[in-house]
């Protein structure tokens, strides 16, 4: 009996993007922008803590979905891990063997710092690991369209995972 072809999967999570998109989906349009200062100043405030808890992401579900495409050979999450909204996920992600890539606050790093760093790493990985067959991009903004297109041109199957209602249609169209 012939062995099925081994599929090798790389997962890239723009964690800030997903956390903010999901928070807004749970609490209403632009809710994170309105709550950001309160979250930063006092994440332990009971009302803030409850809003964060209600907007928790099922990280395991995302990783399990990506693993359904094959062997996970690398999984990276990009965010400012010192931010209270992201820090609560650290142990969960580390337990799932996710590499945490530290991005410094937006003022020092630039608004789309995660987009640039994630895209550069993904393209580098495709050349460094030529046996990668699948690339999973966990994000929702259209800035990732060129990355999805490049991955496809380099022969990779591209999966996009985003928050319903806030994922750019162009990103969905660029993925397989």
Listing of model-derived features with the role each one plays in the protein:
Residues 7, 130, 173:
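Structured loop/turn residues at beta-strand edges in well-structured enzyme cores
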Residues 23, 148, 172:
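A short local structural element in Rossmann-fold oxidoreductases
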Residues 88, 121, 146-147, 170:
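Phosphate- and divalent-cation-binding pockets in alpha/beta enzyme and binding domains
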Residues 176:
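Receiver (REC) domain switch/active-site residues of two-component response regulators
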Residues 113, 128-166:
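Active-site histidine-anchored catalytic micro-motif
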Residues 56-59, 116, 145, 165-172:
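Amphipathic alpha-helical transducer elements in NTP-driven molecular machines
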Residues 1-121, 127, 152, 157:
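Domain-level signal for Mg2+-assisted phosphodiester chemistry and nucleotide/NA-binding surfaces
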Residues 85-90, 163-173:
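Short, glycine/polar-rich helix-capping loops at beta-to-alpha or helix-loop-helix junctions
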């Amino acid at each position: 009996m012939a062995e099925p072809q081994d599929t090798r999967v790389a997962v890239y999570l723009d964690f800030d993007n997903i956390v903010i998109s999901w928070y807004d989906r749970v609490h209403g349009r632009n809710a994170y922008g309105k709550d950001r200062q309160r979250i930063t100043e006092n994440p332990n405030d009971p009302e803030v803590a409850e809003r964060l808890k209600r907007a928790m992401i099922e990280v395991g579900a995302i990783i399990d979905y990506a693993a359904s495409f094959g062997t996970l050979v690398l999984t990276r999450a990009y965010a400012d891990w010192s931010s209270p909204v992201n820090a609560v996920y650290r142990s969960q992600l580390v337990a799932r063997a996710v590499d945490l890539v530290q991005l410094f606050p937006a003022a020092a790093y630039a608004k789309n710092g995660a987009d640039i760093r994630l895209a550069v790493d993904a393209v580098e990985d495709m050349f460094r690991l030529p046996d990668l067959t699948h690339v999973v991009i966990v994000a929702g903004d259209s800035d990732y369209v060129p990355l999805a297109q490049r991955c496809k041109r380099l022969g990779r199957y591209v999966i996009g995972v985003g928050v319903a209602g806030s994922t750019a249609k162009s990103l969905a169209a660029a993925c397989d």
